[in-house]
Structure formats: structure tokens, C-alpha cells
Amino acid sequence: MIWVAVVITMLLFILVAKPTGIYLEKAFQGSKKLDKVFGPFEKLIFKITGVKEYNQTWKQYALSLVLLNGFMIVVVYFIFRLQGVLPLNPAHIEGMEPTLAFNTAISFMADTNLQHYSGENGLSYLSQLIGITFLMFAAPATTLALVMAFIRGLAGKELGNFFIDFTRALTRVFLPIAFMAALVFVALGVPQTLDGAVTAQTIDGAKQSILRGPVASFVAIKELGNNGGGFFGANSTHPFENPGQMSNILQMMLMMLLPTALPFTYGRMVGNKKQGRILFVSLFMVFLLGFITITTSELNGNPALNAMGIERVQGSTEGKEVRFGTVFSSLYATVTTAAETGAVNTMHDTLTPIGGLVPLVNMMLNTVYGGVGAGFVNIIMYAIIAVFISGLMVGRTPEFLGKKIEGKEMKLIAVTILFHPLLILGFSALALSTSLGTDAISHSGFHGLTQVVYEYTSSAANNGSGFEGLGDNTPFWNITTGLVMFLGRYFSLITMLAVAASLKEKTVVPETVGTFRTDNGLFGGIFIGTIVIVGALTFFPMLVLGPIAEFLTLK
């Protein structure tokens, strides 16, 4: 029965992807029906904020994005610092420590949601609503806006205006879908209130304080926007965030909704629907391989415990919620790291070595399917690399969407693809070389190395999940992961927008018999091979020293 439920969940991922992709294309390309519904409200926003409707250059677009995001980071930072004297604080929570506020503000603006605090006792309701939830809408809207400009550039069109795209992302995508999802979560038992904690009497007569809050609205955008931060410290393992299997499946659907839709949006916007389908199918195969690997490992249990003859019918149950079970916990772990969300319904630090390797590889690749917008930019980056390598092998100038891929584009892509592993491995080396970093490690040996690398991989990939055995709420970890999140977020977005702007200016080369097609199975295979060779092998030495070595020692 459990496998039937898994297959149905997978089919739901597939069935909603194309319709959502079509809707996104219409939402950003000026559908008359949608303009009638949302247009008046959007024009009012533009009038109040003074936004002028004109096409921006890639530099203007990128600058607008960075300045708006930077302003939001500063505002939310001060909300966190001053929450102790601000209203909507029934628990009388004090202001955040400076480095923790720095880390948290960047974390949520970068769509990472790395949390070095526990939500129920670290933030007031005002901070949760105006700080956290606000950024949970703004962060994915930023990258969804950028990916639309990116695709327009690839299609040879004007990039558009960041402020207009940003507003449309909020009004036409995130607000309506999150509102409907929140209502469903309330129906499934997720609380939604501004009242303080409830005092309950336990069976043995003791009193217990049960915390609650505006959880349903929080969870809806947390999953839809690939944010992942928890209202409670336990995240989606907490019964108030994720009461049962129905809410669990809905959360996974929301996480996958936009990342899986973007290949179809791309195909329609560039006039090559088959290429969009090939990208979707290729990535789904990689996703499926990851799910099979982690599930097999978790169901086989811990080798050390198996050797002792301990029952393992349910597999490795350490760190897992009984109401979800091993299989759906494995699926959730695959989804949350493939879609770069970071929400967890099981503790990743307790996964088996090979089970923990899958989420780690998903984040290192940062492209299966990746988070809202940012992940798709990485997908196209790998697609261009695949075309470039194929062109070199046959001695032909590579072309992508009829545009020649030349030195300028490849230099930008080369810098972008190198920057991700440099952030992860460089900061991991720094943490391991000083007691400021190593003092936070709770496990010695191979698992301790994985804890450190996982933290920086999660930060660089804007995922936010963690091996929570790491004691990371220290100035060193707050500052270094904050820097990694900021650089990992904005560097690749800006460089790839420059690539799209460069391709926009090029004339389309007529297709000939010798043109390498990017809308067939051959390209799909080369695309997957490129992801594995260029992406996975970059981190292979670290994976050998971490989860693979741990697995071999347990064996």
C-alpha cells in the first residue's frame, strides 16, 4: 500500500507540472484574462511605489534586484534585533544576538532558511510575520522574476523590468496559491492563530505549555516558495506543522510545484516545447535515482545494528516520525533537497551514510530541479555546457537555441560553475582548520566531516537543511554561513543573467543537418552525463572522505 501511495504522489508531481508551467508563462507574458484580474491592483502598487514600466538592461535588472534585497535584509535585521521592545511578543522573547540576526536575515532573503535558532522561542510573532513570512514571499518572488528575464534573454527578447516581474510573481503566483494552500492546511489540523501558548494539564497532573501561532500561513509559503524554515524548531517533524500523511504529501507537492513547472514555461517562451519536456524528463530520472538510492539504504537499516541481529523490518527508524515511516521520510528528504527547500520531516543527521549522501549530492548539483528560479538557471547552465562539450567533440561551433556559444558566455559559465564548489570546500576547509569550527562538531571522524560540509553545502545551495548535530549557533558559524548564503545566492544569478543578455544580442543561426538538436533523447543523455561528470565528480573526493568512508567502516 505504501508503494501505491508513493507512485500516486510521483504521478501528482508530473500531472501538475505542465499546467502550472503554462500558467506561469501566461502570468508573466501578459495574458489578457490575468491582466483583467490582477492588472488594476498591480497598477495601484506601481503608482504608489513610483515604478515606471520600461525595459531594463541586464545591469539595471541585476542592480534593482540586489538593492531591493539588500534593503529588505537591513530592515528585517533591525526587526530581529529590536523584537524584545516591539509588539506582538506574548512570550516576551528578547532581541536576537547580532551575528544570529545577521545570519537569519540573509538566510531568509537568500531563500535558504538556515536556522541557527529554534522558531518557537527565538522569534516573536511580529518577527515571524513581518520578518520571516515577508521574506518567504519576497525571496522566491525575486528569483522567479529573474528567471523570467533570463528566459526572455535566451529567447532574444527584452529582459523586462525587475519591479514589474517581482510584483507579478507576488500577486499572480505566490499570494493566491499560498492563500489556498493555507486554508487546506488549516482543514488538515495545522493551527492558525495569534494567541499565545496554551497551558495544558498532562495525565500525571503536571502543567505543560503548548506553543502555537500563525502556522498554516507560514507552512504554505515555506513549501511553495522553496523556503524550508520551520515555525517550530523541529520543522515539519512537528505535528503542528505536519500533522499526518495528507499534509506531508501536500507539502511535497508544493515544494515540487514551481521547480518542475519551469521547464515547461521555458519551452513555451523560447518556442521549443520539446526541449522543455526533455529537460523535465531527464531531471526526473536523476530525481528518481536519488529516491531509489536513499530508500534502499534506509530500508536496509544500519549495518552496525544489523550485525547485532536487531530487528529491521522498518529499516533505519532513528530520527524518523512513525506517522510518516521510512519510505515517505526518504521521499521527503529527496524532494526537499532536490527542490532546494530545506524543510525536514526526519533528522538528516540520523540518516544512514548512503542515505545522507543523496541529499548532500542533490545540493551539490543544485539542479535537480533546484529551487524556484535559481535552480532553473543552473539547469540551463548545465545544458549549455552539454552543448559546448558536444560541439567540441565534433569540431563544430556549439549553438544553443540557434545562438552561437562563444568565449564570453563560456568564461562566465566557467566562473559560475567553479564558484559553487569553491564556496563549499573553501569554507569547509576554514572551519576544519580552526577550533572555532571544530568545536561545533558533535561526531568525530567521517561523520563529523560530513556535518561540516553539509552545513556549507546547504548554505551555498540555498537549501537550509542541516545535520543538526552541529552546534552552529556561534559567531563563527553565523558569520561564515551568512557570507556563503549571500555569495551563493547572488553571484550565479548575476553572471547567468549576463549570459542571457549576451545571447539576446546574437542573431539566430539557421538550422542545418549538422546542427546538434537539443530536443531529443540523445541530448537528454548528454545533459545527464554532464551533470554527473562536471557536477558530481567535483565533490567526489569529499564524498569519499565523508559518507562513503563512513559507510565502509560500518560495513
From Swiss-Prot:
HAMAP family per the record? KdpA
Please indicate if the UniProt record lists Glycoprotein as a keyword. no
Cellular component GO terms, alphabetical: plasma membrane
InterPro entries, per database record: KdpA
Which key words tag this protein in UniProt?
Cell membrane, Ion transport, Membrane, Potassium, Potassium transport, Transmembrane, Transmembrane helix, Transport
- Into which family does the record put it? Belongs to the KdpA family.
Q: Look up keyword Electron transport and say if it applies.
A: no
Q: Which organism is it from?
A: Bacillus thuringiensis (strain Al Hakam)
* Superkingdom of the source species: Bacteria
For this protein, the record's NCBIfam families field holds:
kdpA (TIGR00680)
State the protein's name. Answer: Potassium-transporting ATPase potassium-binding subunit
Name the predominant localization: membrane
Q: Please give the subunit comment from the record.
A: The system is composed of three essential subunits: KdpA, KdpB and KdpC.
**Where in the cell does this protein reside?**
Cell membrane
Which is an annotated GO molecular function term of this record? Answer: potassium ion binding
Transmembrane intervals: 2-22, 60-80, 130-150, 173-193, 246-266, 278-298, 374-394, 412-432, 483-503, 525-545
Stated membrane topology is: Multi-pass membrane protein
Record's function text: Part of the high-affinity ATP-driven potassium transport (or Kdp) system, which catalyzes the hydrolysis of ATP coupled with the electrogenic transport of potassium into the cytoplasm. This subunit binds the extracellular potassium ions and delivers the ions to the membrane domain of KdpB through an intramembrane tunnel.
